Amino acid sequence: MGAEIRSGHRSRHWQARITKYQSFKGTKREAQIELVRLMDAVRRGDYIDPSKVTVAEFLDRWEKDWAANNVSPKTRERFAQLITHQVQPHLGNMLIQKLRAVHLSELYGRLLSNGRVGGGALSAKTVGHVHRCLRRAFGHAAQWGLIAQNPAALVHPPRVRQTEIEILRQNEVEAMLASLRSRNALLFTIAIVALGSGLRRGELCALRWSNIDLESRTLRVEQSIEQTRAGLRFKAPKTKHGLRSMTLPPSVISELRAHWRAQNEQRLALGLGRGSPDDLVFPAWDHQPLMPNTLSREWSRAVAAIGGRRISLHALRHTHASSLIAAGVDILTVSRRLGHASPTITLGVYGPPLREH
């Protein structure tokens, strides 16, 4: 078993080589590190000949070794589901060095027609998630010298049609709030805040009183709750745009003051003492964090009891954004308030429906 580090002709890249000629391209320092890793793998008996690695073996190792340390638990969980249910049954036994772009193109076609577990078509959006997962994974396979190039980079995912978003009319908002006020005080206040701020479900669940200044009427988004099989996790926004401050309407502040008083009365009645700034604004009944999935279930039940069309919780965010744009608020301000990475995203979501209205 031989090994060497060398610089290629007319190239500033260095290569670490180990028989059978596995190559890694990068700086000299990176090549030295990779060579040490390869030699350690050989000594431990963990070295796998790249020519014998199947797609399933690589993706399993990539998910456990790379994804586990470089993406959020929720994203890793999603990657594992897509790999297990949508990729491995079709391509798992193929040698990764035999994989070509045409195989991925055929895979996407099969998933669109019958890609669901148990049968049925997958949506173009979900197939797009599969594509992004594979593009990232096979990009690393190419970087690590297992394949010559990333086949997913040569394939276009299926086009996702623009879906119609839910925007509530004023009479629908009024009817919904009137019913919630008498039926469920917590959901009523959540609806008021969502309609006045555009916060996402996870951001509402993670909101603390320390994030709200009732005197200056400001709210600061600092965290979100992520729900995985392992439990709940408070996490910072994915990008700097998600970390944001906004001014709330006086009507929202008024309801939050009433909610603060009611929450403290409940705590005192239970012998828990007065609340603190670190308390959650919208906790569960036992004053533990409210799970996002639980909130969605409770919301669906409450809306179903009202009657009329089913209104999703996320529709309140859409309604908030569309009302701002309709009132003449510039798109950059709306985008920042929603925590979008760019105004282009905001226009892509809300431009078409506003033209129709």
Name the predicted role of every residue range.
Residues M1-K52, T239:
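Short, surface-exposed polybasic/aromatic micro-patch for ligand or macromolecular engagement
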Residues T27, R159, I225-Q227, L338-H357:
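Catalytic-site neighborhood detector that most strongly recognizes the C-terminal catalytic loop/helix
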Residues E34, D49-A142, L154-P157, E172-V173, ...:
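Short, Lys/Arg-enriched alpha-helical recognition elements, typified by the DNA-recognition helix
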Residues V42, L112, A142, A194-L195:
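Alpha-helix C-terminal capping/helix-coil junction sites
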Residues R116-G120, E174-F188, S197, M246, ...:
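Short, basic (Lys/Arg/His-rich) helix/loop patches that form interaction surfaces
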Residues G120-R132, Q143-W209, E215, E226, ...:
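Basic, Lys/Arg- and aromatic-enriched nucleic-acid-binding interface segment
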Residues Q223-H241:
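Short, flexible, glycine-rich and Lys/Arg-enriched loop motifs at helix boundaries
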